[in-house]
């Protein structure tokens, strides 16, 4: 279920300030953030944002198709190592 339209999308204030500052300076350096719940806005297109996954920061390059999604969707928190194989002697 989505967020109410009258409330608007959530974005961390500190993240929005950093993005707007880089837009005014034409700077495209990597922005580190722990705010996985922030919504991707059109202002962020072209920026690389390093999203924390609980262990490390994963760089995410923002494109037009990502608008409206959350930053955490692009930084997986769990590693999938495949299903365990059956042991030969377990019959």
UniProtKB/Swiss-Prot annotation:
GO annotations of cellular component type: cytoplasm; small ribosomal subunit
Native source organism of the sequence: Prochlorococcus marinus (strain MIT 9515)
Keyword Cell cycle among record annotations: no
InterPro entries reported in the protein's UniProt record: Ribosomal_uS19, Ribosomal_uS19_bac-type, Ribosomal_uS19_CS, Ribosomal_uS19_SF
UniProt GO molecular function: rRNA binding; structural constituent of ribosome
Family: Belongs to the universal ribosomal protein uS19 family.
Pfam families cross-referenced by the UniProt entry: Ribosomal_S19 (PF00203)
Top-level taxonomic group: Bacteria
BP term (GO), one: translation
Protein purpose: Protein S19 forms a complex with S13 that binds strongly to the 16S ribosomal RNA.
Name of the featured protein: Small ribosomal subunit protein uS19
Database matches in HAMAP family: Ribosomal_uS19
Keywords per UniProt: Ribonucleoprotein, Ribosomal protein, RNA-binding, rRNA-binding
């Amino acid at each position: 279920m989505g967020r109410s339209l009258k409330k608007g999308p959530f974005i961390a204030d500190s993240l929005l300030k950093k993005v707007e500052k880089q837009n005014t300076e034409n700077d495209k350096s990597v922005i580190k953030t722990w705010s996985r719940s922030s919504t991707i806005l059109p202002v962020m297109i072209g920026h690389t944002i390093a999203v924390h996954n609980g262990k490390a920061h994963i760089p995410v390059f923002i494109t037009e198709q990502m608008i409206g999604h959350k930053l955490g969707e692009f930084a997986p928190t769990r590693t999938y190592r495949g299903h365990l194989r059956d042991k030969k002697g377990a019959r």
